[in-house]
């Protein structure tokens, strides 16, 4: 009997230690999920802002290029590449135009208030899919986590609070001591894996061309330079030169 008590005592001590470890990992996980969600939202806002500023200009530049190539194909009717490139330029112009329609009225910055960040952490610590002990529970948590990320991206505090009401976390006390220990150890492994995945996702995000452009533009703005407008000015100059080229080609064609 004493040996059984001793084993249970050791399990209880181990469970207590693992729960402390798990509590710390939950905090880390919530913080990292918040960091990732914030980074994605900030980049999404920037992409819409960038597209809203330069998208129409790129579309116009491609339309002008298509006109140039169209005229060139008339000068050289046997040159198939001119017609193909003209069609490609028109398609690219249409794509830029469609993308711009989808990104109208972008918010300049993504600035979630501190109360929203705290609420995100609180909810994420409770519902995160990597705390699941079964496939069904994991799926349910995944749905709620998706709702949380979407609401956070919209800065919608009122949409986040009902997620807590919807969630009813099972109590560990309903399991035997040994089962509780196994469950917590499994959760720890899952959370550590997810933390590594988040670090990888953040690193991949920072290596994208759009993220690096955002960093450069943000850095320039802090120094009082509007780099985005400078990019737009460069495109505008290209458009002017291309239009001049069209006039010259059209004149030659008439001659």
Where are these regions (language model features)?
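C-terminal accessory/regulatory regions appended to core domains
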Residues: 1-255
């Amino acid at each position: 009997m004493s040996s059984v008590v001793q084993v249970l005592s050791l399990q209880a001590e181990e469970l207590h230690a693992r729960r402390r470890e798990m509590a710390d990992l939950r905090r880390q996980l919530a913080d990292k999920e918040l960091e990732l969600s914030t980074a994605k939202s900030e980049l999404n806002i920037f992409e819409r802002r960038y597209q809203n500023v330069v998208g129409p200009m790129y579309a116009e530049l491609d339309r002008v290029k298509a006109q140039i190539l169209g005229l060139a194909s008339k000068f050289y009717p046997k040159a198939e590449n001119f017609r193909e490139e003209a069609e490609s330029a028109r398609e690219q112009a249409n794509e830029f135009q469609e993308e711009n329609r989808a990104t109208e009225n972008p918010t300049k910055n993504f600035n979630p208030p501190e109360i929203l960040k705290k609420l995100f952490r609180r909810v994420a610590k409770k519902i995160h899919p990597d705390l699941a002990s079964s496939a069904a529970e994991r799926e349910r948590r995944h749905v709620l986590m998706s709702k949380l990320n979407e609401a956070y991206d919209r800065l919608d505090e009122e949409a986040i609070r009902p997620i807590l009401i919807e969630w009813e976390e099972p109590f560990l006390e309903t399991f035997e001591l040994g089962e509780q220990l196994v469950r917590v150890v499994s959760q720890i492994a899952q959370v550590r894996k997810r933390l590594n995945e988040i670090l990888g996702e953040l690193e991949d995000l920072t290596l994208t061309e759009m993220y690096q452009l955002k960093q450069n533009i943000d850095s320039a703005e802090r120094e009082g330079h509007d780099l985005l407008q400078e990019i737009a000015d460069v495109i505008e100059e290209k458009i002017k030169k291309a239009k001049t080229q069209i006039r010259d080609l059209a004149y030659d064609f008439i001659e």
